[in-house]
A protein has these predicted regions:
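A general secondary-structure junction signal
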Residues: 30, 72-74
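Short, conserved active-site loops that position catalytic residues or coordinate cofactors/metal ions
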Residues: 27-38
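Short, positively charged loop/turn segments that connect secondary-structure elements
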Residues: 36-56
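Positively charged, polyanion-binding regions of nucleic-acid-associated proteins
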Residues: 4-29, 53
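A short, conserved structural fragment
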Residues: 64-71
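Alpha-helical DNA-recognition elements
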Residues: 61
Length: 92
C-alpha cells in the first residue's frame, strides 16, 4: 500500500459517508468498489476485493484520527475485527 492509495481510500470513505444521510453507515466493500471503479475508469482493471487491504488500513487510520467510528449490528466496536460498518465520528 502506498501513501497515495491510503489517502485515496480515506478520501473515498469520507466522501461516501458525506453522501449518506446522517446516522447511516457504509460497508468497507463500498469503499473498495468505489476505488476499483475509479481505477478501472482510468484504464486499470482492478478487482474491488484486491482493494480491501488498502481500505482496511485507511479505516484503521481514520479510527485512530477520530474521524470515523465502527460498529456491527448496531453495537460499537473499538477497533476493526471481523465484519464491521463505518459511520461518521460525530454521530451517536
Amino acid at each position: 500500500m502506498t501513501q497515495m492509495a491510503d489517502t485515496e481510500a480515506q478520501d473515498a470513505t469520507l466522501a461516501l459517508l458525506a453522501a449518506r444521510a446522517p446516522g447511516t453507515t457504509i460497508c468497507p466493500s463500498e469503499v473498495a468498489r468505489a476505488l476499483a471503479t475509479a481505477r478501472s475508469a482510468g484504464g486499470d482493471q482492478v478487482d474491488w476485493r484486491d482493494m480491501m487491504p488498502t481500505v482496511h488500513a485507511a479505516i484503521d487510520q481514520l479510527v485512530i484520527d477520530g474521524r470515523v467510528r465502527l460498529s456491527w449490528k448496531g453495537q460499537p466496536l473499538e477497533a476493526r475485527a471481523g465484519p464491521y460498518r463505518i459511520r461518521r465520528a460525530a454521530e451517536p
